[in-house]
């Protein structure tokens, strides 16, 4: 009697549980795929220096991104963590060394292609930044 009464609700709950399991499964597959692709893209010679970036003289983060994969990259996201003297992360900022929406350089990064980048950071760095940082690629979007 109870089974007949709540049959539709039970079926709906089972379908909902299956959808959640499938969603988690596909997210893991997508995350693993992204991690494999991130291994094929290299940040090289990332450094802080004084120079001209976007036509402005000042302190900037410079480097090179190298696509060792088979796919054309239209957007690459890089997280830079600015550390204090105790090694604590004081600020995280996103930069886009490859960005198809950029007015300045909207070209994609083709396989076996490298590109130099530079971004001004004078207005970004925290006051207690000691000059150390880490930079990692966190996201890739392919053409």
Predicted regions and their residues:
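Hydrophobic residues positioned within well-ordered beta-strands of beta-sheet architectures
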Residues: 59-63, 76-78, 117, 133-138
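Membrane engagement elements in two modes
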Residues: 1-60, 115, 133, 143
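Generic "edge-of-domain/loop-turn" microfeature
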Residues: 48, 53, 70, 83-87, ...
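The feature marks short-to-medium sequence segments in extracytoplasmic or secretory-pathway proteins
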Residues: 71-111
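Solvent-exposed loop and beta-edge segments used for protein-protein assembly and interaction
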Residues: 55-57, 72, 111, 129
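Terminal connector regions
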Residues: 111-143
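Asparagine-centered strand-capping/turn motif at beta-strand->loop junctions
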Residues: 65-69
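Exposed aromatic-hydrophobic patches
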Residues: 62, 104-105, 116-121
């Amino acid at each position: 009697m109870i089974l007949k009464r709540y049959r539709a609700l039970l079926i709906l709950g089972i379908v909902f549980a299956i959808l959640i399991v499938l969603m988690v499964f596909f997210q893991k597959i997508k995350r693993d795929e992204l991690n494999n692709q991130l291994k094929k893209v290299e940040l090289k010679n990332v450094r802080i220096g004084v120079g001209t970036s976007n036509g402005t003289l000042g302190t900037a983060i410079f480097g090179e991104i190298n696509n060792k994969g088979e796919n054309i990259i239209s957007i690459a996201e890089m997280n830079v963590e600015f550390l204090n003297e105790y090694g604590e992360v004081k600020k995280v900022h996103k930069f886009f060394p490859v960005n198809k929406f950029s007015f300045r350089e909207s070209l994609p990064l083709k396989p076996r292609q490298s590109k130099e980048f530079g971004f001004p950071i004078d207005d970004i760095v925290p006051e207690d930044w000691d000059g150390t940082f880490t930079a990692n690629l966190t996201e890739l979007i392919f053409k």
